[in-house]
Amino acid sequence: MDLAIITLCVLAVAAFLFITELIPLAVTAMAACTALGILGVLPSKQVYAGLSNSTVVLFGGMFVIGAAMFKTGLAEAIGIAVVKKAGTNQVPLMAAIMLVTIALSAVSSNTGTVACLMPVIIGICQAANISPSKELMPLAIAANVGGTITMIGTPPNVIVTGALTAAGLPTFGFFEFAYIGIPLSIIIVLYTLFIGRHFVPDKQAGAMDEEAVKAAAEEAGASGDGAPKSKTKMWISGIILLGVVACMALGLKTLPLHTAAVTGAILCVVTGCLKEKEAYAGIDWVTIFLFAGMLSVASAMEKTGAGKMIADTVVNMMGENPNPYVLTAVLFLISNVLTQFMSNTASAALLAPIGISIAQSIGADPKPVLMALGIAASMAFATPMATPPNTLVLGPGGFSFNDYVKVGVPMCLISLVASVIIIPIFWPF
């Protein structure tokens, strides 16, 4: 059988498993690359090559640094300080919550940020006689959009970066995502404050699933044990984070991104901000293995021509010489709609290699197409299962499925329009 057909069959099975989640996402990705090796599509040396990719190392290091922020109490301290200064008026409080959440989500786990701030926000809302639902939905929204500002802010950013690397193409810089992430954050915050908040229901707080919140906090590296926090370690973790970000911003040749991240992670453990086991626990291993596995799948699609076959089919459906702006908008919609019902990490991993092939088939730069796919996967606001932050606020906010639809659909459309306008400015076709 033709190797391209074999690759497409493996991809189809992986897509089905990603959507249904009959088995864990990471297991699906690793099984896919293993199958490609067994079936002779990939040589043995390339089957698990994704695990040694520098982007995987970068992501692992930043996971540990982010976990240190939560474990030392730094993230919570920042959140409490900012939110309390905003007072108890609903709109200023909402603005403060969204801004601090965006900032924290850009450099750490957005799931951990929500889990960390949610109890604080509920307490303030109850004291101020404000319905928690009015502030919890903006919290989830801000966590989603904040992750789009840096490469490590959200898994889809890492996925699209890795896809470019696997294809041997120029890749995105660490802060390059800010060109679209910051404008989108500003637009979404302003929309929420002036228009979107009117769609957020005013409901009595539901029962907080303390186990779910605790699990999310622990996954991000927060202890959740209520133990006193060391201010010294808070300062140390903050200095380490700032130092790593500064090194990345300077783009030092002797200290590439992944080396800076690992150096910071080592310092977090050596200085006692995290114990060794806590550092391991702070890493999102699902994202690591899913990303590494799909890198090999992407390589197989490029090597066998399977990606080109899919791309040619899509382009032919849109007619000869399709407008790259229209094509980007269509791919944004596909990615965004798909993410409403499956993991944004999985949808980005599934679509990234296809996006590269489509861009190359029409003679366009893959960067704007990949950026649109990644952003679309992160800007999924319309269902409670689209992203972990959406799910976390579901119970405590007392939200229904339709509440997410009413609030999220306009934001998805706004994100589409803004992305189609902004992305080509910084990444021309």
Regions found by a protein language model. Give the residues of each.
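Hydrophobic transmembrane alpha-helices of multi-pass small-molecule transporters
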Residues: 1-60, 64-66, 177-312, 328, ...
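Juxtamembrane and boundary regions of transmembrane helices in multi-pass small-molecule transporters
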Residues: 6, 65, 128-141, 146-159, ...
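Membrane-embedded alpha-helical segments and adjacent helix-loop junctions characteristic
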Residues: 13, 27, 34, 38-130, ...
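Transmembrane alpha-helix interface/packing and boundary motifs in multi-pass membrane proteins
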Residues: 14-23, 100-109, 141-152, 246-253, ...
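Alpha-helix N-cap/start motif
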Residues: 44, 132, 174, 257, ...
